[in-house]
Amino acid sequence: MQITRVEATPRSGEGLRDVRGDVVRRRLQADHSIQLTEVRSIVGFLINSDITAEQISQRADDLFADPIIEHSLTNQTFLQSKEIFDQVPDAVISVGFKPGVTDNPGKAALDGFRTIFPNASIESDISTYITYAFYGVKDQATPEFIASNLYNGLIERAQISTAEMCENNEWPMIEYPARPPQEFKQPAHIDLEINDDKLIEISETGLLALNLEEMKAIQSHYRDAVVRRTRQEVGIVENQPTDVELECLAQTWSEHCKHKIFASKIHHRDLETGEESVVDSIFKTHIMKPTHDMQQEVDWLLSVFHDNSGVIAWDDEWSVCMKAETHNSPSALDPYGGAMTGIVGVNRDILGTGLGARPIANTDVFCFGPPDWQGDIPENLFHPSRVLRGVHSGVRVGGNESGIPTINGAIIFDERYLGKPLVYCGTVGLMPRKLPDGRESHIKTPTAGDIVYMVGGRVGYDGIHGATFSSLELTEESPSSAVQIGDPITQKKMIDMLLEARDAGLILSLIHI
């Protein structure tokens, strides 16, 4: 196995332009009044494979570049080419993903690579990076400031060449992000016979987002004599949960999964009349109960509140399902990745409804701080205009690459969304009322002894603690691991495969986990 570097950059000439570079140039001008004469871009591919550099070079234009509008180069960088880059830039910045973080462009390139080289090692892998060359910077901004607007340090790494380094031909060279070897560790047993301060410490250090009352409820559960006896009978440590058990409880009780605020008792006082009342769960009182009451009167509410999405009968042949959810905290840390994960996640909720529905349309509502905000921004959080662009792009790309159009939406601006945006992602799905074998498509039929498969894209190091993180306030120490990056292209393949399996009668039950 060896690393081969392939780069592609737009050609210059009449009618040709560097779109990526122009987008960055206009963004810096709009957000920071930085007037640049030009920004040029290079897309890089780092190929870890047993295929030789010579073989790759011969096919570079078939996969990594469009020879009509782009140049390609193997095991060199275009910045060293005086023919292509005939002027010395004022700054150069290269951006790539950190080791283990999901790299969707790399995955797509790898699919094509394996098509062209079917005998390549199964261990072959491709990572990507983008290099930007800036002209006309002068004293308007430092390279470090420009870089801070190009990459997200939670999931990406950047290398910078200053004007002096550029004059000396010292160019940034992003290297292949080798993943550290994975080591299996036995689950740790957690002693809960501790004081309240230590219970809170376990919750905080483990990003469990559980308050003292919840931690004490868990402590009480593992003190229960029946629980201890049952655990002892099956060979489990009777009085100490594993860290995995605590993670499962914390995820189940998270705001993302449990919606504790909507489920709690709300003490309400009417400011005009002074009348006081208690609402026992906004969700159960004002959403579930009216829906169940309606279900008694109509025959078209087929499935509500117990599956991945609700199902209604559209006509005698088709059912429609719809689901919407928020993805606020991840979108604050990484607007593009957080929003993309939100939309492809709710796509999977539709797919996981009943025996499988096809997602056919997306919708969204975004709430951000004012895009022209001139005040302070908390450290490690982004300006509202950057959040707006990233979220919009993430939802757009997530839908388009899955083959699901976004048909409508709304955007609201308010100062109260400076600290955390509100990102609603919704999907509409379609399913036949009955499958070819006569089963009703909205009814799952699992039985004991069924074979269970888990399908999807490869899991990266991103997205850990994403559910529990939804219950925490955003701070300067918010964890990078909580940001997950979706993979819409792989998901599109999965959707088509599962719906084909559904129609063949192979699926008894499925769920989005």
Predicted feature residues:
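Core nucleic-acid recognition elements
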Residues: 1-505
